[in-house]
Swiss-Prot record:
UniProt function note: Large subunit of the glutamine-dependent carbamoyl phosphate synthetase (CPSase). CPSase catalyzes the formation of carbamoyl phosphate from the ammonia moiety of glutamine, carbonate, and phosphate donated by ATP, constituting the first step of 2 biosynthetic pathways, one leading to arginine and/or urea and the other to pyrimidine nucleotides.
Family note: Belongs to the CarB family.
Carbamoyl phosphate synthetic domain: annotated segments: 555-942
Positions bound to Mn(2+) 2: 299, 301
Name listed for the protein in its UniProt record: Carbamoyl phosphate synthase large chain
Enzymatic class: ligase
GO cellular component: cytoplasm
Region Carboxyphosphate synthetic domain, residue ranges: 1-403
Obligatory cofactor(s): Mg(2+); Mn(2+)
Highest taxon listed in the record's lineage: Bacteria
Amino acid sequence: MPKRTDLRTILIIGAGPIVIGQACEFDYSGAQACKALRAEGFRVVLVNSNPATIMTDPDMADAVYIEPIHWRTVEKIIAKEKPDALLPTMGGQTALNCALDLADHGVLEKYGVELIGAKREAIRMAEDRELFRVAMQEIGLECPKAEVAKSLERALEIQAKVGFPTIIRPSFTLGGTGGGITYNRQEFEEIIKRGLELSPVHEVLVEESVLGWKEFEMEVVRDASDNCIIVCSIENLDPMGVHTGDSITVAPAQTLSDKEYQRLRDASIAVLRKIGVDTGGSNVQFGIDPQTGRVVVIEMNPRVSRSSALASKATGFPIAKIAAKLAVGYTLDELKNEITGGKMPASFEPSIDYVVTKIPRFAFEKFPQADARLTTQMKSVGEVMAMGRTFAESLQKAVRGLETGKVGLEPTGLDLSSEDDLVVLKRELKAPGAERLFYVADAFRAGFAVADVYALSYIDPWFLDQIEEIVAAEGRLVTDGLGSIDGARLRQLKRIGFSDARIAQLTGTNEVAVRALRRVLKVKPVYKRVDSCAGEFATGTAYLYSTYEEECEAAPSDRRKIMILGGGPNRIGQGIEFDYCCVHAALALREDGFETIMVNCNPETVSTDYDTSDRLYFEPLTLEDVLEIVEVEHPVGVIVQYGGQTPLKLAKALEANGVPVIGTSPESIDLAEDRERFQKLVQQLGLRQPPNCTARTAEEALVLAREIGYPLVVRPSYVLGGRAMEIVYGEADLARYVRDAVKVSNDSPVLLDRFLDNAVEVDVDIIADREGQVLIGGVMEHIEEAGVHSGDSSCSLPPYSLSAATQDDLRRQVIRLAQALNVIGLMNTQFAIQSNDDGSDIVYLLEVNPRASRTVPFVSKATGVPLAKIAARCMTGKTLVEQSVTCEVVPAYYAVKEAIFPFAKLQGVDPILGPEMRSTGEVMGVGRSFAAAFARAQEAGDIRAPQPGRAFVSVRDPDKKRVLPVVLALVERGFGVVATAGTYAWLQQNGVACEVVNKVAEGRPHVVDLIKNGEIVYIINTTEGRAAIADSFSIRREALQHCVTYSTTIAGAKALVNSLEFRGTGPVWSLQELHKELQV
C-alpha cells in the first residue's frame, strides 16, 4: 500500500524532559520520525517541552512548539495548526498518556484528528493491566497470576491469593514508578498506597512473584498488511525482579534454544495482532521459568521504547523511521533498508554476527539516602552499549564505557578471606544493586562454583561461565606478569575484551608499557561494520565497532576529517545537552565539506544515529579506544569540548600522543580548571572572586576556613555536576566533611570558597574565534539564589531583575576572560551578584568553563542563534565575521528554563536543593512577561499550581524579612497561613494573621500531620546547616509523597506566587514565529 494522500499535516508529541525511565531515546525516535515524514512531503508539527532535544530544532519540523505536554495546551496547538493526524508512538509514556487524554476529552473528535501508529483501543488494551491480561488469555498466552486493585482493601484480598513475595505494578506510569516487590504486609501496604496515588487512573496490579525467572524481550515491527518482522531478541542477564531498564541486557538472546526462540517469536507476533498494533514497532517482554520452561507474557509497549532504541543501534535497523513511514500507509516490502544502501527491503529480518551488551548507569552517589537495591521500579539514569565478537569482549568494553572509574571487572574491595565480608558478598549476589556484576566476579575470585553463584543470583549459568573465564584469565596474568606474554596470548586477552589499562593493573605495569608491547607484537584492533545483514550485502554506511580479528572493514577515505568525541552514558550533570552540541558540530562541519567522525557509546542518543555523521564508531571513550581510531582515520582535528567532562579528561593525554585537539587548547582548559593558576589570572585582570583557598590536608582546611569565614562552599577539585560539594556553616561541619566526604591529599586538594548568601547567580554563554572576537550568546539570571547548583536552578533569558549597567559589566568581564584564556569555541561563565544597601551591585566571578555548557541548547532555542554550530566552525578556523554573526540577540519575550528532578522515583531522598546537582532534565516556557514565562515553565514541569487553602511557612532568620511580601501576596489571593513559632512571631509582628504549628521535634500535632491529612496546599521552607536540614527533611519528603507544591528558596517562592495568575492562560507560539520576531 503506498503512502496515504488524504493526510497533509501530522502532529507528533515528544516525551518532555529527561526523567528516570524516559531519557534521550525519545529524542532519537522523534527526530527520526520528523525527518522521515518531512522527506515524504508531509507538513510536521511537533510539541515537546524539552529544549535540550534535537527534535525541537526549528529545522526539524515545520512548526515546533516548546510547550507543556498537557491535553489543554495541545488542544490550543491543534486548534491553531489543524493537523489531520496525530502520531503518539514516538514520545514514550508521556505522549501516549497525552494522546489518550485528548481522545477522552473529545478533542480529537472535535477537530477531526486521526490517531495513527496506534489506535486508542490498542493503547488502552496494552496499558490497562486487566484488559491486557484478559486479551492474553483469549489468545492462549499466560500472564503471571494477578488482579487489579483500586483500593488497599481489594489489594489485600488479592495478595492473600498470590502469596508473598508480591509484585506491584501501577497502571499508566513510567519506568515502574510507584511499583516494587514486597515481602511482608507492612511493605505491601506502603507500596500499594504510593502506587494508587502515583497511577493517573489510581489502580495497581497485584501480581504473583516470578523473581529469578529469565527475562527476554522481542522487538517487533508490523505493517497494515500484517507483515511482521522481529528486529531483535534481547536477553536480560539479570533475572526477573529487576526492571529491564536497570538490567544488563544482551542482544541477540544467548541462551534460548531455536525451538524456544521460535515459540517467543510466534507469541510476540500474536500479541501485536491481538492488541491491534497495526503499524509500527512494539516491544513484548516475556518471563521463562528456568525449572519448568513455563512462559508468561509480562507486558508490551505499543510504541517505540528504550529497548527499540537499543535494538536499532544494535542492528542498524532504524525502527522509529520505519514505524513513522508505516503509520502513513507504507508496507514493509515497499520500504528499503538504508544501511545496506537500499539493497534489501525493510521486510528482511536483521541478522547480526556480533554480540551487543548494554549496561545501565546509576547515580546513587548523588543520592546517598536512596535505597540502592534494584527492583521493578527503574532507577538508572543512563546506559552504555558495546559490541564485540564474543559476549566477554562486549561485556568488558561496556564496563569501561560506563566511566565509573573501572577499566575491567575490578575487585569490589571486599576482603574475601573474612567471614563477615563473605556474608556481604552473598547478600550482594542475592539482592541486586548497581555493582552486582563486580560481586559476581569477586565470588569466582573467592572460589565459588558457578552453581553456587547461580543459586544466589539466578543469573543464567551460561553468562556465569563467561565471567568465570574472564576472572581465570586475570588470575593467570597476575601470576605470569607482562614479560611472559607473546602475541598469540595478548591477542586472546584482547579478544575477550581486556583493556590495556586492566592488563597494566593486573601485571603491575602501566598503560603506556602495555600499548608499547602491543605495537611491538603487532596486536591491533580491526573495525567491523554494522550492516543488519551479517555481511551478506556490501554496505556503504560506515557504522563501526572494534574487535581483534583479521580483516578490517574501516576503509577510511582521504578526505579532510574532523572527529567529535561524544559524552558517553547519560548521568546527572552530563546529559542530553552535551549530545545536542555534538550533533550540531557534526551537522555544521558536514555542511562545510568536512568528513565528520562521531565516537560515542550511548545507544539512546541522536549522535549515535548512523546518518548524523559520515562515520560512526560505537566505542568506549577511553584513551586506548580513541587513539586506535585516530590511527586509522588521521583526522585534521578532534573536538573535545562538546561532550562534557568525558572527552575533556582525555584532552591532555590525546595532545601528548600527537592528536590535533582543536578549539581551546588543553593548556587553556587546564588554566581555567586549576584553581591556583586561575586565581592569579583573575587578579591580573582586576576581577573579583569570593575569598577562596585550596587545602591539601584536613588540618590546613580548618586553619584556612577561619581566615575566610563561614559559611563556606567546599568541594574536591575537577568535578562536574557539583559531585561531593557541600555548604558548611561551622567548624564541626567542615571537620566532618574532610573526614567523611572526601580524601584530601596533595593530588586531590579540597577547595574552600566563601559562600555568598542571598546573592543572585548569573550564567553567560559566549563564543570566541581565533582572532579574539567574542559573541555573547546569552545572559541568564538564575531564579534560585547562589548555592543551588546552576544545573538545578531555574533561569531566565533575558534577566528579569538585573540592571542594564550590571549586565553590561558582566559582558565586559566575560570578553576579557575569553581573550585572556585564548578561547576558541564555546565558554560558559558563572557570576554571583550581591546588592549593597545603597542599591549598587558587587559582581563576583564564580567559575569559567571553556567548553560547551548545559545551557547551550536552551540559549539557542531562546535566541534562534545556533551556538554549537557557530562555535564548531570557529574551531575549524572560520571567524565570527566570516559567519556573519557578531551581534548578541536579546529577545523581546522571556524564556524560562526549569529543572526536573527524580525525587519521586528515589525513596528516602531529601528533595532540598544545594550545591550538588541532582536534576535529570529540563523544560522551557516562553511568555511576554517573566511571570507568564515562569508559569508556562512550571506547567511544563508538572509543578502543581497551589489553589487557595492553607500555606505552611517556616524560614530561617535571614529570610524572614524577604518572605513577608510573598506571604502578603498569598493572603491577598485567599490563602490562610500556618507557621512554626519563630516565623509565626515575625509574621504576627508584621500584621499577618496566621496560626502556629509545631515543628516535628516539638511534639504532635505537627506540620507533617497536617500534610498527611491533606490540610496544606503549599509550603515555603528554607533552612541552613545540617541539623536544621535534617530536622525539616520529613516536611519536604511528605510534601513530595502527597503531591503538595513546595519552595525551598525565597526567590523560588516569590516567582511561583507571582506567576499563579498566568497559569493555563495565554496563546501558544511556535519557535518559528518567535524567531521571526527576532529577525525584524
